[in-house]
Regions:
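Conserved SAM-binding strand-loop segment of SAM-dependent methyltransferases
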Residues: 2-7
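Short, solvent-exposed coil/turn elements at secondary-structure transition points
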Residues: 8-10, 76
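Alpha-helix C-terminal capping/helix-to-coil transition sites in glycosyltransferase folds
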Residues: 13-16
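Short, Asp-centered acidic motifs that coordinate Mg2+ and/or phosphate
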Residues: 18-19, 99
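Oxidoreductase and adenylate-handling cofactor-binding alpha/beta cores
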Residues: 78-100
Length: 100
């Protein structure tokens, strides 16, 4: 289950893939987000979303049309150290947090 730039669109035929994580250079975010949506996959795209507001809108519209979620995120929120810090803050283990 390895996909390249050349065979990316064949991802639509793989029911084991639910989500595509877009970690390409920002100039390719719109193209591959739209291709993933057309393939019927949800999309998690690294920030920044795209180079232009127009590309952002195209990404949103492609995912809406396909009925798929589009999420823009930064990988840091999923790193173990950061997840642990969030839990400690919520439990009050670090005292009153004033700024992060």
């Amino acid at each position: 289950n390895i996909y390249t730039y050349q065979n990316f669109d064949s991802i639509k035929d793989n029911p084991e893939v639910d989500v595509v994580y877009i970690v390409l250079p920002v100039g390719l975010h719109a193209e591959y987000t739209i291709r993933a949506a057309r393939a019927g996959k949800h999309v998690l795209c690294e920030k920044p979303m795209a180079n232009t507001p127009e590309d952002c809108q195209k990404m949103i519209e492609a995912c809406q049309k396909a009925g798929k979620k589009l999420m823009i995120a930064y990988r840091a929120q999923y790193e173990p150290f950061n997840l642990d810090a969030i839990q400690r803050i919520r439990k009050g283990e670090l005292g009153r947090v004033r700024q992060i």
